[in-house]
Amino acid sequence: MASFLKPVNSQGLWLSLLLAITYLFLLPSAGQSLDPSGIGLAAGCSQSQGGISSFAALPRPCNDSVCTLPDLGWSCQRTAQDTANQQQSPFNHTGHFLTTSGWTWPNWTCSPSQCQLLIHLPTWQIVKQDFLLLLKEWDLLTMCQRCSDLLTKTPGFILRFAGETLILVANLIEFVLVSWSLWLCSVLVYVAQAVPGKFLLYMAAFCTTFWAWPRETASSLIRIVTTPLTLIGFLNKTGIGLISHCLALTWNMFMTWSLLPWVTLMKMMKILITSSRVLTRSGRPKRTSSKSLKHKLKISRAIQKKQGKKTPVEERTIPGVQIKKLREDPPKGVILRCTDQFGDHVGYASAVKLEKGQTGIVLPIHVWTDTVYINGPNGKLKMADFTALYEVTNHDSLIMTSAMAGWGSILGVRPRPLTTIDAVKLKNYSLFTERDGKWYVQAAKCIAPAEGMFRVVSDTRPGDSGLPLFDMKMNVVAVHRGTWPSERFPENRAFAILPVPDLTSSSSPKFTGCETYSEAETAYEMADNFSDGEEILIRTKGQSYRTFIGSNKVALLSIRKLEEELSRGPIGLWADDTEDDESAPRRSGKRIIPVDSGETKSSEDPLPKGRGVSSTPSRSKSRKGKACPSFRNDAGTEESRQPQEEKGQSCQEDSLNSTQEIQGQSTHFVPSSGTGRKSCESSPHRPTTKITSIFEDFYRWKEPREEAPGFNSVGSCPFTVYKCPPKGLSSWGERVARTSAFLQACTEKYSWPETGAEAELSSLRYQAARRQSAQTTAVIPPKDVREDLIKRTTEAYRSTALPAPMWAHNFDESHMRFEFWECVRKLKGQAGSGVPYAAFSGRKTNDKWVFDHESTEDLWETVRDRLFRLLNQDFIDPVQAVKDGLVDPIRLFVKLEPHKMEKIRNKRYRLIASVSIVDQLVARMLFRDQNEEELLQHMAIPSKPGLGFSQDHQVLAFTESVAALAGTSAQDLVDNWSRYLTPTDCSGFDWSVPMWLLEDDLAVRNELTLGLPHGLRKMRETWLKCLGQSVFCLSNGLLLAQTSPGIQKSGSFNTSSTNSRMRYMLALYAGASWAVTMGDDALESVGSDLSQYARLGIKCERAEEFDFCSHLFRAPDVVIPKNLEKMVYGLLSGTSPESPLLADRFSWLSALQSILEEMRHMPQDFVNMLIEHLGVGDLVE
């Protein structure tokens, strides 16, 4: 019945028409009229009886004034014999149809002016008489023949009926539109006669508007002319809805009155049964109990303790993991205790700061289930006083607040900021646990995301659920909620809060929070258009959201209707007030008053000219681009998700595809996408972006002067970094080192390097002289040998082959922007922005360049301009490349880590070549997909940059893969490794790399790029030339240019991937049949000839143990650290466990925890000895 009351659906009519057309083509006699014998064709609607009328055309009016068509043959003339036969027949037989008396088939009565449909319905007596006559006169064959004739005629009748109906509707629409247009014209004539002056003025304004916006004006005129049709459609829709509601109301009233007797009878039976039970119960003697209320509570409490908790959650200590704790109190007023009705401990909750200044309490749902009271430092409140603001049942997460005035003061809470899931990184966090009335802090390590939550290495006990995980700023980043099932993961788990707009995250775009995290650190990444993971429902106050969570991605939240989802969980249990559908259901029945939020203002200062070392880029309101929203709507259009095109002088529409020589300068016109989008062209001598215009006079060039072998001093720049005092042991480290021979040996073996321009220049001179000496005798392999090695390497990396990025085919603006934002999201936020961008005041790190939309747009302009410069121009020399805007100088500095004393004495410090943020993004756009695919496929290719040894199963998987290459078992490989492999390590590899090896690596990359466009190949080749022969910038601003190409830049985006592949190619040159590599480390087959490395100018040595990546293999799944003394020396430096600052103490504890994880397979006596020598036995549990 419910479906009957719905509005009429047009699908049935279309289905009938489709069936009619099908019959029309399947049955040859459809639409044609047979003669009375059933075999001949009837005369058509024409003067000649021999004519045949087509069923596809509409019938023409006949010459007679009125022509009644009794059948579907549309015959206008009948013979006298037909008339006589019709009168003699006992039936009213028209055409070849047999109709009984009183029956008349639907007939069209046509005249020259109109056509009418005549339908005559018989009475019941006639129907009965005709039915009896049919049974008497007709046999089965006759009935089948008549039915077949009826089916044959039906399609033609349907088509004619539909055609006439369409004609009538068209005439009606024509009449309405003509009448409406005449009325509009009469109004215009009246206005012209009444006020001719204003009429002329209005006409002039209309003509101007039509000239300025012709499309919009014409659209408005069309809407005015067709207003009656729109009104008719609205009234039609409204009328159908009204009729539907009336029918539904009538049906409900009918059902109510019809079922009333039965409902009354059932209620009377229930009353009788209840009365009989009461009478029976009153006749029994009443029991008397001598137990007091106190005794009852005692018994019920004992029963509850015996039964245990309603929602038990297992806690776990990971076997083999030694977790140390420091005696430390947590931040006051943050951790709250949850108890049941008897005061017994259930779990914990955390006071957090939400958006708009609101205070909330976050806790697991299973803790909320057993909690009756929430206890704070000052007092306690009942759980019934709190209402739900956020709930995700899949993650067992809940956020509550209270409408009670001053509830925070009653509990004594001091809330801390709450971060969302996209800010959680894979690192150590502070976890405070209470043991015997004392609080301890431990380094809980978040090692991996899983099922929308996190795998956390921590030591917990039953009752610890709800404890927060703090970062270094004491912000709440996650909440502990027990352990994983034993068959899933051995670690504990924690959940984080999803970014809900105006509740747990701001509704305005956040750039630093979602754009600058490293791909190796961030656990989950917010992504748009992602739906491959598990669907998660987030219920909040008055609104419901949904998202999808994959292995490491979280889809942007989308709004969802708050319907049946409220049937489960705390919010569903609190649904007491069903009338108030504007707020979330709650337990206490009290409404929550929202807190008003303030507005923030942004600076609009323009960019200054000149060096710009004390200014920041401007933020223009006119620019539009893509932000990183915290949520999205499902109904959002494509334009709302894509950045809008920017209008600037550097872009022009052009479809040319050739290279032209204009006044001796090469200018390449970028092909457009063919869809009206803009392509960009940059002039080599005129700054086209705001950022490049600032640095127009930033560099002071001078005549080249040799400063080191292979390096010339070519100028300077205002960028300077003050020399920091040398780092050394802390006072605590010096004290404990004097009391231990082991620690004293560590301090004698390692030390901290010098920093500053002098240290950088001295180390540069050492490395340059060493490189020049090696390259003097080095040889370059023949071309055919190089090509053969390129083919072999390409086959080894064949599984990482990917199509070329889409933006490189047509340089479409939207595709380039999308790739740019993907690259920005993978930047390391705290990494230096490089030269010259770090010269801005307050812009020394990457995250300061993408902190809002305007600054990111300025960066996008610069990256886009540089890409097209790489495409349009050629590399001449390093200085000219900087002048032409092809590349930025590379910042050179000493890596701040412990060095061996031998390197300290020789001033052979490890140098880091830091690439600027623009060049970093350019490299990511050129090679991002390829490098990410290598990380995913590291177990299937020789390069192992994605490998880790922090877990035993990772070690075992690597050992088994190497054993498969060597043709033996993992255990045999470890026991007899010298028979199967050769561990090698290259000294000073980055500074020894020749240019031809970098070119061969690029050749392999191009071979692995399917459908490589010419433009992408050109940009990659120019990029490599700029990288291979660069300008270095020291800490004092001195600029040094390479005179000979080569040297791998350690801070480049491709360093890890390229070094690993070049290391594999070198192993092939040395004669190895197989090799696995990571950076400059390699495991090669026993047939490798290490003397070939020296011929190529690279120093390579064989290790004395089964060593790979500073780890020594002791079993197929057991490795121990090789540089333990270096790690311990770092523990004695910097921060200490005696620091007055909590952040310093936790930093030291995290370092200790990392060392203990590396030492997890070392003898326990050695670990205890280390703790004893450090003298922290009384501080560390």
UniProtKB/Swiss-Prot annotation:
One of its GO terms (biological process) is viral RNA genome replication. The keyword Transmembrane helix applies. Residues 649-677 have a biased composition (Polar residues). The chain crosses the membrane at residues 172-192, 194-214, 218-235, 240-260. InterPro entries: DNA/RNA_pol_sf, Peptidase_S39B_luteovirus, RNA-dir_pol_luteovirus, RNA-dir_pol_PSvirus. Specific enzymatic cleavages in vivo yield mature proteins. The protease probably cleaves itself and releases the RdRp (Potential). Cleavages have been shown in the P1 protein, but since the N-terminus containing the serine protease is shared between P1 and P1-P2, cleavages should also occur within the P1-P2 protein. Residues 979-1094 form the RdRp catalytic domain. The active site is at H366, D396, S465. GO terms for molecular function: nucleotide binding; RNA binding; RNA-directed RNA polymerase activity; serine-type endopeptidase activity. Belongs to the luteoviruses RNA polymerase family. This is Protein P1-P2. It comes from Pea enation mosaic virus-1 (strain WSG) (PEMV-1).
